[in-house]
Amino acid sequence: MALNVEKNDFSVRMASRRSTRAFRVALATGERAARLREHYGRLFDEEIAAHARKAEDPDVEIPVPDSDFPVRKRYPDEVRPAQIEVAKLLYGIHGIERADIEGRSRVNRRNVMAFDAPVMGFVFVREDMLPWSAMDAGLMLQTLFLSAKSRGIDSCPVGILATWREPVEAEFEISEGYRFITGFALGYADPEAPINAMQAPRPPIQLLRGR
């Protein structure tokens, strides 16, 4: 089903490799979003509880997420410092120390809930057209976010949602060959929430030198 949006919306005019648009978008509001939050929350809580039990009993098995991509793979050393810097800033705003596992889990659970935003979004890309399908999806998302902001609507990519495919499989008919790459949220940012005042540092774009 094609998304019904204004013809002058920039998000439908975004560039695409040979106009293939080899990605799909699923949107959830109302009761469907509530079911998704419950499902995601349950999977998240089960994993956290399993880790707590494993600390007491090494034989406890940790549930393995059914993600389509290795979302928890360690960041390469070249970019890891930037990732650590943002993590320290994020948890610091919440007053959470590195050793505070429960506190970190509370923050991450808010991500899983998509911050209770009225719209939850999910993006799928054709596996046989990677990396171009992922590039197109990224162009679409950035354009969508900018277009939404121009209308007073805030947004946030929520990559942690791609840790589990099961919840979206239960709610949407996903075309064969499409892989779940990221989620996102649309709504209105709480101006009183300290996290919304966070300004993440942006490493400079690295230009390659000519030979």
Language-model features: locations:
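Acidic, surface-exposed loops and disordered segments
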Residues: 1-211
